[in-house]
Every structure is written in C-alpha cells, then in structure tokens.
Amino acid sequence: ISEYQGMGTTLTLAWLKKAESQLYLAHVGDSRAYLVREGHISQLSQDHTLVADMVKKGELKAEQVKNHPQRHVLTKALGNDPWLEVDIRKYDWQKGDSLLLCTDGLTNLVTDEELLQVILAAENAKTATEKLLTMALKRGGYDNITVLLAIG
C-alpha cells in the first residue's frame, strides 16, 4: 500500500469571462478565493474543513479556528471520493475587481485585512504576490504557499 493512499488535494479554479462580466469558481478543500471590490475583501470560497463545519454548527467560535488541533482536517478533497460534490458558483465581475486565489500556506499566516491592504497598495499583481509570499515566509512559512492574483 502506498504511503499516499487516501490522501487528496485541494482545488480552487476560476474562469473569468470578461466579455460577459462573469466569474465562475469551482472549489474543494481549504485553498481560497477572494474578491477585492471597491476597497473591500470577500472570501468567495468556503473552507471544507472539520473546524469550518464546527463553526457553522455553532460548536466552535471563528476566533478559535486558527489554534484548533484539527484545523487542517479536510472534509472534502480531490482524490478521496469518486462522487465528490465540488462547489461551483457564478459571480458578477466588475471593472476594477481583483481576484486572489491562494493556499492555506498564505491564509494561515496573513490575515484577510493584510491581504486587502497589500493588494490595494501594490502597483501590479507581481508586486502584490511577491509581498504576500514574503510576509508568509517571514512568519514561518511552514506549508506550501501558492498565490495567484488577477487585478481588473
């Protein structure tokens, strides 16, 4: 039996149809998608984790998630279930919007407010992603860190 049997991976996929002003998002796991619009940041994806489910049920407070011993336990992942239901959503896309896709290696170490401030202050997507990556690495960067940013 392979040491990797039973393991899965996360997926956050975005398809932007600018001509139709539509953003399509497919998501499974604990990587995230954020929309930055008019100076505000919104998490579009929902974490598929045990602790996220506990928060929804009122069994855990949101501020307890970061330190919970089971915070990395996924409830959905690609590769574990042939009948997996992937979250698929459609959003309106507006001129000036930005889309951030990232792994939990970033969001475990950088707050949503910090994400927003870096994106708003950056002159371009490359500068913003490099700054976010540097912030996470300086704070310990113990997990893989992937950061993709589309600035509209």
Regions found by a protein language model. Name each.
Residues 1-152:
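PP2C/PPM-type serine/threonine phosphatase catalytic domain
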